[in-house]
Amino acid sequence: MMPSRTNLSAGIPSSKVKYSKLASTDDGYIDLQFKKSPPKIPYKAIALAVVLFMIGTFLIIIGALLLAGYISKGGTDRAIPVLIIGILVFLPGFYHLRIAYYASKGYRGYSYDDIPDFDD
């Protein structure tokens, strides 16, 4: 007589374990593996985009007022650098806010994964 195999994890002899055959229509997949997890929203990156957008807007307005002469300190030699810095700060903020807005509304092709996250 051969010794019976035992299930080492439970200590139960294998002859006493009941098995049931899987249904023939089972393709080996479970529904849970196809379920999409809710998107992880990068709050820090969106907050940084808001700050960049606001600072850039402020600098563009100040630069335009300097250039138009409504603010008389400095003239054109100060207006152009302020405008350039304002545009350089405004553009990334606007870009990432636009992606965040479209991702929140569920537009096709936009997701929160497109926004760089600053998780440590």
Curated annotation (Swiss-Prot):
Membrane topology: Multi-pass membrane protein
Keywords: Cytoplasmic vesicle, Endosome, Golgi apparatus, Membrane, Synapse, Transmembrane, Transmembrane helix
Keyword rRNA-binding found: no
Predominant place of localization: membrane
Cellular localisation: Membrane; Golgi apparatus, trans-Golgi network; Cytoplasmic vesicle, Secretory vesicle, Synaptic vesicle; Early endosome
GO cellular component: autophagosome; axon; early endosome; endomembrane system; endoplasmic reticulum; late endosome; membrane; recycling endosome
Name of the featured protein: Transmembrane protein 230
Species the sequence originates in: Gallus gallus (Chicken)
Upper taxonomic lineage: Eukaryota, Metazoa, Chordata, Craniata, Vertebrata
Gene it is expressed from: TMEM230
